[in-house]
């Protein structure tokens, strides 16, 4: 089981999260109502928080202590969540980019032209092959 999966498993009830974060239940529910955290629900409809949720609550608490308002917190958290996606996109793009040598480029172009020629003709005969049948 990967570390990311473990950290996102809903384990903690609100009482434990209150002790870990030193936030009140009302504050935690308020952050949920404002879409800052998304705790899972148990079968009895009780909130269950993951390590990620606790980390996010601690980050929210730190931002509030610095004087950041709710709109600012939402922007900061949205930006922080978008950055890993951008980094992942950059990682997938980088392996595709590499400099081709002149010989590799010629071979690639030659193969593409040959493929294009096959599809444009629609048959496997060369022009010279057809002329034998008509002379």
Swiss-Prot record:
UniProt xrefs under Gene3D superfamilies: 1.10.1660.10
Pfam families: MerR_1 (PF13411)
Chain positions covered by the region annotation Disordered: 80-101
Entry's Gene Ontology molecular function annotations: DNA binding; DNA-binding transcription factor activity; identical protein binding
SUPFAM superfamilies per the UniProt record, alphabetical: Putative DNA-binding domain (SSF46955)
Record feature DNA-binding region, as residue ranges: 14-33
Induction of synthesis: Under conditions of nitrogen-limited growth, repressed by TnrA.
Matching CDD domains: HTH_GlnR-like
InterPro entries linked: DNA-bd_dom_put_sf (IPR009061), MerR-type_HTH_dom (IPR000551), MerR_fam (IPR047057)
Task of the protein: Transcription repressor that represses many genes including ureABC and tnrA, during nitrogen excess. On the contrary of the MerR members, which require longer DNA sites for high-affinity binding, GlnR requires a DNA sequence of 17 nucleotides as minimal binding site.
Protein name as it appears in the record: HTH-type transcriptional regulator GlnR
Native source species: Bacillus subtilis (strain 168)
Native organism taxonomy: Bacteria, Bacillati, Bacillota, Bacilli, Bacillales
